[in-house]
């Protein structure tokens, strides 16, 4: 019987990145380099955490060409002019919070014991106001009514032709045209009262047994997405609290199956359209590079495993009490990508200051056409719904930094990344290009067998060595790189003297591997621990090999 990773009780401090390069080079050659308790023999993955910093974007990187094919093989040999940043005016200027200088000197302690929960009295991360140049207008209301685009669902168009009449606005910030997209607030202030009923035109809450996951609601400030923005007499729309509860109950009732038909899906297409529109607007109002503060919990790939996502919420806490950062790969491969991405987007709309999502390599039109999400949308709803989600994917942030110490990304690092401002200046919405910085952040992998940047056998981006990781951490003064992108047996796996960790949050991935799932918890004191999800019992167990996803 395989040894459970939860039996590990290994507390350690990640070395400070101020170590000089000479000593780092010497340590690399010592035999003890590969003796870490969870050191990978093959590439591994890791993810990101939340906090948003402040900067003024004067330029942005032009959008790249669309990724022609997710699995397209390229020689990965870039000409020097391919690495140049093309300046352009960025319409989405962001500001970043003022960091706490007292936290800069903290070491990053990691506890690999199982499921160390954060205190329920944890406070929300500090986030500072950010002004954004936008063609949208803010609806000044007292009950968080969000209006939809003026055009009809049948006329759904590309992102460039969107025309929003209003976007998410809290009652306390609506009086200012430069209101913040992320406000500092204590979690203790989020006391919810019983849910308000959904307006006409939306499905009522399911009659199935209530979910075991709490969904605190507020009758004072319900978040209501209005279907017809210019018709004030119409009350037709979607209550986000009702939408979340509906999804939680669907998961509890276990009625979601791969063969689910359109008539069984609990949302109308126009309701999904509303969710996508407003989530997209929130993402565009937040930076491409998030700068976050602890406490926070980081989740790796979930890949449409909706019931396992619910297990994560039960284990690590609901978003009303817990700050979250998801590292990408929400769809494809799993049976219930629609429920998974809808629940995450609903949480983003409801808890936009405390719930963060990064882009993974599967948040792409080409990849989702190959690995299941497109087919699921077409089978259960329509291809138009798939297009709505793709337009949201194109606005997702690319990376996050937690308290100046932890760099979070879906895939890995890039040889083209010389300054964090390069990430900040990436203009969104954007497709994933065939090569370059954006592609590397979402597709690259670590490889213990190489000594420098090498071709990736995925046919996209690069692989990088331990030396590349250590150099990256030293240059940017990071103590840890956290990413996902690859299934690992214990749910987490270290690389490069524990300066790099992969986390994967889909246990028993695809129903074929007996892997654990993991969530990384970071406290205010920068103590890190892993909360583990045991794989469900399998009739035919397969030996797990590190698999790129």
Swiss-Prot record:
Domain of life: Eukaryota
Taxonomic lineage from the root: Eukaryota, Fungi, Dikarya, Ascomycota, Saccharomycotina
Residues at which Mn(2+) 1 binds: 301, 303, 329
Note: Present with 319 molecules/cell in log phase SD medium.
Annotated spans, Disordered: 1-50, 64-85, 133-158, 189-219
Residues annotated for Mn(2+) 2 binding in this entry: 329, 361, 410, 485
Residue ranges, compositional bias (Polar residues): 1-13, 205-217
Keywords per UniProt: Hydrolase, Manganese, Metal-binding, Protein phosphatase
SUPFAM superfamilies: Metallo-dependent phosphatases
Pfam families the UniProt entry points to: Metallophos (PF00149), STPPase_N (PF16891)
Any one Gene Ontology cellular component term annotated for this protein: nucleus
Catalyzed reaction equations: O-phospho-L-seryl-[protein] + H2O = L-seryl-[protein] + phosphate; O-phospho-L-threonyl-[protein] + H2O = L-threonyl-[protein] + phosphate
Enzyme Commission number(s) from the entry: 3.1.3.16
Cofactors (names): Mn(2+)
Protein name: Serine/threonine-protein phosphatase PPQ
Gene3D superfamilies: 3.60.21.10
């Amino acid at each position: 019987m395989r040894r459970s990773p939860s039996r590990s009780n290994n507390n350690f401090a990640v070395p400070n990145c101020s170590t000089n390069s000479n000593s780092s080079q010497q340590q690399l050659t010592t035999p003890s380099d590969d003796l870490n308790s969870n050191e990978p023999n093959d590439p591994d993955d890791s993810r990101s955490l939340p906090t948003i910093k402040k900067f003024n974007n004067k330029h942005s990187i032009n959008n790249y060409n669309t990724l022609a094919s997710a699995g397209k093989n390229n020689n990965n040999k870039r000409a020097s002019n391919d690495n140049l940043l093309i300046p352009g005016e960025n319409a989405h200027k962001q500001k970043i919070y003022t960091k706490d200088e007292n936290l800069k000197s903290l070491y990053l302690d990691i506890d690999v014991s199982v499921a160390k929960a954060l205190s329920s009295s944890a406070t929300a991360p500090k986030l500072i106001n950010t002004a954004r140049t936008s063609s949208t207008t803010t609806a000044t209301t007292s009950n968080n009514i969000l209006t939809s685009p003026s055009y009809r669902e049948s006329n759904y168009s590309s992102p460039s032709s969107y025309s929003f009449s209003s976007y998410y606005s809290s009652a306390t910030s609506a009086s200012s045209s430069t209101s913040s997209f992320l406000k500092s607030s204590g979690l203790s202030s989020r006391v919810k009262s019983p849910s308000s009923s959904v307006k006409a035109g939306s499905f009522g809450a399911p009659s199935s047994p209530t979910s075991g996951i709490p969904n605190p609601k507020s009758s004072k400030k319900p978040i209501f997405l209005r279907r017809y923005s210019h018709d004030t007499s119409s009350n037709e729309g979607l209550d986000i609290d009702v939408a979340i509860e509906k999804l939680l109950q669907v998961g509890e009732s276990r009625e979601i199956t791969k063969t689910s038909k359109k008539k069984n899906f609990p949302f109308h297409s126009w309701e999904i359209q509303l969710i996508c529109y407003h989530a997209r607007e929130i993402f565009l109002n937040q930076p491409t590079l998030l700068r976050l503060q602890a406490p926070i919990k980081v989740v790796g790939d979930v890949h449409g495993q909706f019931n396992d996502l619910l297990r994560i919420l039960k284990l690590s806490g609901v978003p009303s009490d817990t700050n979250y950062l998801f590292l990408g790969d929400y769809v494809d491969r799993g049976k219930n990508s629609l429920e998974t991405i809808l629940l995450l987007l609903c949480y983003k709309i409801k808890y936009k200051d405390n719930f963060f999502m990064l882009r993974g390599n599967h948040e792409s039109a080409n990849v989702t056409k190959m690995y299941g999400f497109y087919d699921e949308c077409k089978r259960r709803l329509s291809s138009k719904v798939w297009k709505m989600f793709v337009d949201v994917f194109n606005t997702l942030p690319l990376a996050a930094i937690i308290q100046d110490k932890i760099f979070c990304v879906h895939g890995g690092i890039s040889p083209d990344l010389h300054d964090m401002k390069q990430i900040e200046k990436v203009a969104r919405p954007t497709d994933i290009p065939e090569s370059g910085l954006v592609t590397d952040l979402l597709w690259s992998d670590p490889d213990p067998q190489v000594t420098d940047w090498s071709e990736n056998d995925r046919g996209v981006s690069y692989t990088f060595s331990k030396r590349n990781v250590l150099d990256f951490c030293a240059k940017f003064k990071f103590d840890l790189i956290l990413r996902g992108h690859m299934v690992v047996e214990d749910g987490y796996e270290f690389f490069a003297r524990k300066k790099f960790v992969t986390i994967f949050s889909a246990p028993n991935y695809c129903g074929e591997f007996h892997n654990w799932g993991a969530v990384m918890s970071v406290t205010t004191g920068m103590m890190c621990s892993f909360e583990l999800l045991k794989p469900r019992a399998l009739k035919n167990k397969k030996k797990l090999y590190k698999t790129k996803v």
